[in-house]
């Protein structure tokens, strides 16, 4: 037995849950944040049907289940299902006893206070963890990039945030949230593929479209020009084989889909695009720190994985910012998991060890201790 017990790091996203051990360089378990319940009564006796399935098992049985996501727009909305996901994480994915390990959880920026308390309560009362901590996702992504100052544009499956951070502290007055993320882009791709004559409607088919999106979509540097290219030649067309063997062809949809990040009007939304939201977030900060934010704009989350997104961000923010400003967009290759990686780094710092909320402190102060110790 090593002299120190490894901390567990769990990053609960709207789309995927990333879990593993502090000090590891990547999460051991990555599975969909889904809980599925059977749609039909089981007819086979002795089949051992369960009343609920979590993660990949729910995904593989999706044809007979109703799938629910307990985390919407980055924030937990269904605590019973969330508890099932945590239970699955500890016992089935990581195969650990939660009462033996400190647990580092992540939360969305601007997470309601009651939610942090509820997370704390479940960890100590349901899972009996010896210690826990709740960290803000974007701050962890910044740590993972080796910085303590910068602005993080974190875009996952359910929500996008721009979070300016100065010397390790998020600046809450300048955090902006955009309810436009991966799931919306998947829905949009479903819609524009329907216009091509391919029909995708069920939750199971949505997963196929998500795969098409992840494999074939990219961000155009110049949207109008790319549209013209797509119209005049077939050079941008790619084919994709569906599970039943049918092959579909996809052309301008490849870049029209993620273009909605820069032009939310494509989705019928009135909000600003991710470039403008990032700029607005910077402008809400003190004039003296803006220079540091422009030069340290870090992309994080699965929805920033499109090829071409960093160049396009650079171009768009350069157009908005003062002309002399040095602008640098940092897009680490591991950014899909940078929140988790930042958590792993944090949990293994010697200086962090006194930051954990212990079971004893929780027993003395109750769930509100989380506001005093995690900021």
Swiss-Prot record:
The modification Methionine (R)-sulfoxide is found at residues 44, 47. The modification N-acetylglutamate is found at residue 2. It comes from Anser anser anser. The modification Tele-methylhistidine is found at residue 73. In vertebrates 3 main groups of actin isoforms, alpha, beta and gamma have been identified. The alpha actins are found in muscle tissues and are a major constituent of the contractile apparatus. The beta and gamma actins coexist in most cell types as components of the cytoskeleton and as mediators of internal cell motility. Transmembrane segments: none annotated. Oxidation of Met-44 and Met-47 by MICALs (MICAL1, MICAL2 or MICAL3) to form methionine sulfoxide promotes actin filament depolymerization. MICAL1 and MICAL2 produce the (R)-S-oxide form. The (R)-S-oxide form is reverted by MSRB1 and MSRB2, which promote actin repolymerization. Methylated at His-73 by SETD3. Coiled coil: none annotated. Actins are highly conserved proteins that are involved in various types of cell motility and are ubiquitously expressed in all eukaryotic cells. Belongs to the actin family. InterPro entries: Actin, Actin/actin-like_CS, Actin_CS, ATPase_NBD. It catalyses: ATP + H2O = ADP + phosphate + H(+). This is Actin, cytoplasmic 2. GO terms for cellular component: cytoplasm; cytoskeleton. It holds the Pfam family Actin. Polymerization of globular actin (G-actin) leads to a structural filament (F-actin) in the form of a two-stranded helix. Each actin can bind to 4 others. It comes from the Eukaryota. One of its GO terms (molecular function) is ATP binding. The modification N-acetylmethionine is found at residue 1. It is found in: Cytoplasm, Cytoskeleton. Keywords: Acetylation, ATP-binding, Cytoplasm, Cytoskeleton, Hydrolase, Methylation, Nucleotide-binding, Oxidation.
């Amino acid at each position: 037995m090593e002299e120190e017990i490894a901390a567990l790091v769990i990053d609960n996203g709207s789309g995927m849950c990333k879990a593993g051990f502090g000090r590891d360089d990547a999460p051991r378990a990555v599975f969909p944040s889904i809980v599925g319940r059977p749609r039909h009564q089981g007819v086979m006796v002795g089949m051992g049907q369960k009343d609920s399935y979590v993660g990949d098992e729910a995904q593989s049985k999706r044809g007979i289940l109703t799938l629910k996501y307990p985390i919407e727009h980055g924030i937990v909305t269904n605590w019973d299902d969330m508890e099932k996901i945590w239970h699955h994480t500890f016992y089935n994915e990581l195969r650990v006893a939660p009462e033996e390990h400190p647990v580092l959880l992540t939360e969305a920026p601007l997470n309601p206070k009651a939610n942090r308390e509820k997370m704390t309560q479940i960890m100590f009362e349901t899972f009996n963890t010896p210690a826990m901590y709740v960290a803000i996702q974007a701050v962890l992504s910044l740590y993972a990039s080796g910085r303590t100052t910068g602005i993080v544009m974190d875009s996952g499956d359910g929500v996008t945030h721009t979070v300016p951070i100065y010397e390790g502290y998020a600046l809450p007055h300048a955090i902006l949230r955009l309810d436009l993320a991966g799931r919306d882009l998947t829905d949009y791709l479903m819609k524009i593929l329907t216009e091509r004559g391919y029909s995708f409607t069920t939750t199971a088919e949505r997963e196929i479209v998500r795969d098409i999106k992840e494999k074939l979509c990219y961000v155009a540097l110049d949207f109008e020009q790319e549209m013209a290219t797509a119209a005049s030649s077939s050079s941008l067309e790619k084919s994709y084989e569906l599970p039943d063997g049918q092959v579909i062809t996809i052309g301008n949809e490849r870049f029209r889909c993620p273009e909605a990040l820069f032009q939310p009007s494509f989705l019928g939304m009135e909000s600003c695009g991710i470039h403008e939201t990032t700029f607005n977030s910077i402008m809400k900060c003190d004039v003296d720190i803006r220079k540091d934010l422009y030069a340290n704009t870090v992309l994080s989350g699965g929805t920033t994985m499109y090829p071409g997104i960093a160049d396009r961000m650079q171009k768009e923010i350069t157009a908005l910012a003062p002309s002399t400003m040095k602008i640098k967009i940092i897009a680490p290759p591991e950014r899909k998991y940078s929140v988790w990686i930042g958590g792993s780094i944090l949990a293994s710092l010697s200086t962090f060890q006194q930051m954990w909320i212990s079971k004893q402190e929780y027993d003395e102060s109750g769930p509100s201790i989380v506001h005093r110790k995690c900021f």
